[in-house]
């Protein structure tokens, strides 16, 4: 949750027995209700771009669902896009104005396969370009470090978080 804002972050399951059109239509109806309720409570609604139990997580879905719902935001994590083979810089360029919260988690792929999510700044993500695009779009929301590595545990994980803090401090303007 952002310090300045109350945000409810959610996804939307895909129903295999329905068409993509039907899934999008039901998702829009669902999010419309959440947005209306959120406005009553001063809470902004955001989708997350993780693919687990959620189909509203890529440029195609954003174009339809977020394109229609102007008050639906995005909690963004570059690693989810990278690990799914997407273009996180393109998604940021096209949808970054709707990003309300950002996770900082590294992503490393080897031979086209997900290897690990090491500390942000020790990975393959072009963080300077990502942050440059975000700042250029006026982003001033939260940045949350999300340690989620198969290899970085305990004290090593703590040192990785410290590294990420130092790494991103140099990009804060």
Residue ranges and their predicted role:
Residues 4-73, 83:
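Active-site acidic/histidine proton-transfer and metal-coordination neighborhood
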Residues 5, 36, 56-76, 82-173:
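Histidine-acidic metal/acid-base catalytic patches
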